[in-house]
Amino acid sequence: MGFSRYVEVGRVVLINYGPDAGKLATVIDIVDQNKCLVEGPEEITGVKRQVISYRRIALTDLTVPIQRNARAKTLKAAWKEADTLAKWEGSQWAKKLAAKKTRAGLSDFDRFKVMVAKKQKSRIIAQKMKELKE
């Protein structure tokens, strides 16, 4: 299977680092081989229109049907019509990021409780497997 995520107008991207790290944006225009113009839309994702390096973004599978250099109002309407935010939140990538964020916010006692729960789960699975083998 070939590579299918290309930098194109309407491609939804995840910003990796910088002030907008972790936010989604949409490619509005391609500036050159190293940069593109992106916008949130600001009302939905909080990303203002800006030129950003390809090194700072990760391409997602999502695209929004827009024209080159689309206005903010047009972009916002296209996002809502395509239900882009819901599609993103339903993706495995977004779920992994949310889980990572939740894990990072755990206290020491919370991590201990997770460890105990994993041990209990493992013990139950081992018992069931033993019963099935007999």
Language model region names:
Residues 2-9, 16, 28-134:
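Ferredoxin-like alpha/beta domains used as RNA- or RNAP-binding modules
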Residues 16-24:
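Short coil-to-beta-strand transition motifs
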